Swiss-Prot record:
NCBIfam families: PRK00059.1 (NF000809). This is Foldase protein PrsA. It comes from Clostridium botulinum (strain 657 / Type Ba4). Residues 1-22 form the signal peptide. It comes from the Bacteria. The lineage of its organism: Bacteria, Bacillati, Bacillota, Clostridia, Eubacteriales. It is found in: Cell membrane. One of its GO terms (molecular function) is peptidyl-prolyl cis-trans isomerase activity. Keywords: Cell membrane, Isomerase, Lipoprotein, Membrane, Palmitate, Rotamase, Signal. A lipid is attached at residue 23 (S-diacylglycerol cysteine).
Length: 336
């Protein structure tokens, strides 16, 4: 199972194209179901087998069975989960089909010799993950539903898709001034070491409750004592409201909470701060702040990050445009 997951982490989604439409007037055999059309994209078919043999879908089903038992697929909840997953993956297969069609239109598909060479290189890179152990590689392929041949075809598709995406985002540029602006607005991301603050808080439901808490603290009552008495955060209440050391760039905390905490000086206690969880009174027990790296030392990294973000935006916009211009028909009844 670990080997299969390792391979699936290397692979994305595969496309295996077949052509046959089963008759809806009779009960379908497994073979007929596999060949039934679940979508058409500009006249090209996506078949049930393409979805059922999709590595990510197979992984989802496997995980569900491990968690909920072998009969999970037969339960009402299981059927709903499977249907939702199939719909999501079908949308991805439709996107891939459009990208492959655009590969022909944009004339970015390499010649067969070059495409095979690139695919073989990727196969060798995957084998290297298994220390070039051919037996283990083949066992993993089998467990994920691939053969050497279908893996190579899948990789050839991915090479074409990558070239289409590169073509669609080739005009994206990031100037030094863009990087400078990002640097100026996100200084805490570029310190010599991560800035941290040791934080305690008291969480209550209403603003009135929070104001009463603040009044008690202003009257010099002990923060930890008040937290143990009134805080509704069960995770920190018994510790006197202590959350511990928090990285300035920690994305696990509410952004409003983080902004308020970072604005406080060491030893300071905030006014009520409203977040999705309620009202907080925040105390900064201590701070560790480090010098900010020079702009020139991080400029290229910032530009690379911003370019990737802009490329993603450009790609998303382009694929939406291509989808709108495509003739797409789905056959939901053939998904189950």
């Amino acid at each position: 199972m670990k080997s299969a997951k390792k391979l699936l982490s290397v692979l994305c989604l595969g496309i295996f194209i077949l052509t046959f439409t089963a008759c809806d007037m009779v009960e379908k055999t497994p073979e007929a179901k596999a060949k039934s059309t679940i979508a058409k994209v500009n006249g090209e078919k996506i078949q049930r087998k393409d979805l059922d043999e999709n590595p990510r879908f197979k992984q989802v089903v496997s995980q569900m069975k491990m968690q909920y038992g072998e009969e999970f697929e037969k339960s009402e909840q299981g059927k709903e989960v499977i249907k939702e997953q199939k719909s999501q993956i079908l949308d991805e297969l439709i996107t891939e089909k459009i990208l492959l069609q655009k590969g022909k239109e944009l004339k970015v598909i390499p010649k067969d010799e070059e495409l095979n060479k690139e695919a073989d290189k990727k196969v060798n890179e995957i084998k290297a993950v298994y220390n070039n152990d051919e037996k283990k590689f083949e066992e993993t392929l089998k467990s994920t539903g691939f053969t050497k041949e279908t893996l190579k075809e899948y990789l050839k598709d991915q090479i074409v898709i990558e070239k289409v995406i590169n073509e669609a985002t080739k005009d994206v540029k990031v100037e030094d001034k863009d990087a400078q602006k990002y640097y100026n607005e996100n200084q805490s991301m570029f310190t010599e070491k991560p800035n941290t603050m040791n934080v305690s808080h008291i969480l209550v439901k209403t603003e009135d409750e929070a104001k009463k808490v603040k009044k008690r603290l202003d009257a010099k009552e002990d923060f930890a004592k008040v937290a143990k008495e009134v805080s509704q955060d069960t995770g920190s209440k018994d510790k006197g409201g202590l959350l511990g050391d928090i990285n300035y760039n920690d994305a696990n905390f509410d952004p409003t909470f983080m902004k308020a905490a970072m604005a406080l000086k060491e030893g300071a206690i905030s006014n009520p701060v409203h977040t999705q969880f309620g009202y907080h009174i925040i105390k900064i027990n201590s701070k560790k702040e480090y010098p900010v790296k020079k702009f020139d030392a991080v400029k290229e990294d910032i530009k690379k990050q911003l370019k990737q973000e802009k490329q993603q935006e450009a790609y998303t916009k382009k694929i939406e445009e291509w989808k709108k211009a495509s003739k797409i028909k789905t056959y939901e009844k053939n998904l189950l």
